[in-house]
Each structure stands twice: as structure tokens, then as C-alpha cells.
Amino acid sequence: MNLTAPKSAIVIGGGPAGLVAAGRLAEGGLSTTLLEASARLGGRAATEHREGFDLNQGPHALYVGGAAMRELRAMGIDLPRWNPTSVRSVFVRGGKPRRLPGGSLELAGWLTAVARNRQEGLGGLSVSEWLRQSLRSERARATAGALVRVTTFVADHDALSADVAAGQLRIGLLPGVRYLRGGWQSLVDALAARAERAGATLCPRAGARAVEQSAEGWTVTLDEQILRAEVLVIAAGGPKDAAALLGDRSPTAPGPAAELSVLDLGLDSLPRAARHFALGIDSPTYLSRHSAPDHRNGVLLSLASYAHAPREQLEAMADTVQPGWRERVRLQRFLPRMVAISAIPSPTNGGLAARPAVDRGQGLYVAGDWLGPDGWLVDAAISSGAAAAAAALRSPVFATA
């Protein structure tokens, strides 16, 4: 056996992680094929365009200070986006909208400290423990918990490690987030176009049925075809999807998945024009305008519950924040129990830094929002996809002489 540079790669999964990996591998000179089981690329980043509205698979935001934005800049991708930050916010407590969330003075000082100082040693603490140790006021803790929910998409703060929350709050506060014009499909389309320009072959409707290691590297079996490559990147879904293909070789999930329920409302206009954003303080709910201010075909509101509440609870929040919305609605879509995060890093497992490694050895890599030490949500997906490609390009593989 001799060491040689890899010449070919197969990427399974056409979401952001897989598209980034495929593009980077093709740029590095590898003959790269991406396989996506569904008819369209994007995974949970795909967007549905209906009645003039761009409907993402749940509320999505791009963190300006996050790993995804850094990688997009490095790839020369500049997506049309807008800043949703608004002073037109309300906080819902006791079923009533309020201008101030409660515990504001103590909370402001704490948030300033979180934004300015990188918090160390939080991987072994739960969010609940961290907030109890950091804030004296119960109201301040409740508001901090609401901010953690909206930045992490996780309602179970006993299960989530505090390092995730601290990192998300820090980049969420400054430099903040942006929403993408055209929905997150614009991100998917840009990554796909770049991968194809680099030479990658993107194959929708091509589901991998089995993978096996072979003397030449890896063999992937499809319904009517067998492909072989020296490098294999699994970027399809979450831990269960990886395990279905890899069996015992699959990384162990660092924790359970996090789910949310989403209600999208396309309105002719807002009954309360000054209310663009609302956060539930004593319930794990959220409301935000997800159409740009200059959108001329109505207003899109996205409501979410991080505890997969029934539709009626989200409608009740809309009644509280935007009374009269039912007379102006022309589109409704309810998505129950969607996967928001494939696996939650727990404090008992060491938190974010202890997530499974992307490089699994022998030309095998796994990418997604639950792998690698860097980032959360799409930041983790894109970061792990880039890390998989970088590791493959610098790692020689064994091949027969």
C-alpha cells in the first residue's frame, strides 16, 4: 500500500453542509459527485415560494459574526439580505404584550458582560445552572432564558450546555443577524452554483441506499447505480441518517434533537404596524416579521414554539401581538414538530467542544449541524462541511501500488 492524494469524492446530502463540502472538494481538484435523495437541494434550508411570500422551513437568521458568514465571505458569496433589528419589539408575559421584559437593569449589565467577554468553562454547565449562578432576579433569569431560546432554538435549558448559549448570545447581540431576501433558497442556490462552477456534479433524486469501504476507498450503492470514490462525506440529515448508512462507524449523537412548531402567516398588512418582533417570556414562543420592509406584497409573520406547542397556542400569541390578523390573512402554514437542531450538546457530555469530530478516518467524513466544535445551527453545518473538505484535501489515502 502506498500513500497518494485522493482523486475523487462522493458527498451524500444536498443541504448547506454537503454543498459547501462538494464545492470545496471540487475546487481542490477532486472529481466530486453530490447525491441528494429528494427532488431539490437544500434540506432544511429549502424555501417554498407561495402567493408572493418566501416560506423558509422555520424562522432562519444568518449571524453576521458566525462561521457561516465567514465561510461565505471566503467563498466570495454576498447574499442580498436585510437587517431585522428593530426597536419595535414587545415581550409577552401573562398573556399581555409589554414594552419592557422585566429585570431589565440587571439583565442589561449581564448581557454587556456576555457580549464583551468570551466565557470559558461553560461546557460542563447547563443553561439553567449558568443563569442561576449569573442572575439574582427571577425576572432577569426568565428574560435571559427567552433570549437563549430565540438564539439557540432550544427550550430545555437543563439539557443544553451553557457554552452554546453564551456563544449565540454574544454574536446575536453584536454584530447581530440578517434575514435573506428570497428566503434561504438564495443561500442554497448560491452554494449550488458555486459547487457546479468548481466542477462538482450535483444529483438530486439520487438516494444512497448503502455505503461500504473497499480497497479503492468507498462504494456507494444507489437504486440503479454503484459509485466509487476515495473520499466519502456524509452530510445527510442528522445522527439517525448517518447511522442508517454507516452503522457502527457513525458518530454517537451528543444529545437528543430539538424540535419546534412553526406558524407562518401571510397578511395584507400588520394590524399593529409598530410590532415587528415579540418574545414570550413565560412561554417558549416567538414572533417576527420575515418579509423585508420594502416587500410590496403584504407582510410575512413567522411564529414559533420551541416546545412544539399546538397551533392554537401560536394563534393565541398572534392574537396578543397582532389582534385583528385573522381579517387580513391570506396565507397560513403550520409545521408541527420540525427538527431545528439535529442533536443538543449536553453539559454531561462536555458541551460544544465535545461534539463528534468531522474526520472519521480512512477517507470518511461526517458533516452537519451536530458535528465539530465550531458554531451552531447553519454556522455548524457550513463550518463542518468546510472542515470535512479541508481535512480530505490535506490527508493522503491508501491505494494499491
Go through the PLM ranges and name each one:
Residues 2, 290-401:
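Conserved flavin/dinucleotide-binding core of flavoenzymes
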Residues 96-97, 106-179:
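Rossmann-like flavin
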Residues 7-34:
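N-terminal Rossmann-like FAD-binding beta1-loop-alpha1 element of flavoenzymes
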Residues 4, 209-310, 355-356:
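Mid-domain catalytic core of redox enzymes
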Residues 26-50:
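Glycine-rich FAD pyrophosphate-binding loop
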Residues 46-54, 62-112:
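A conserved beta-strand/loop capping segment in the N-terminal third of enzymes
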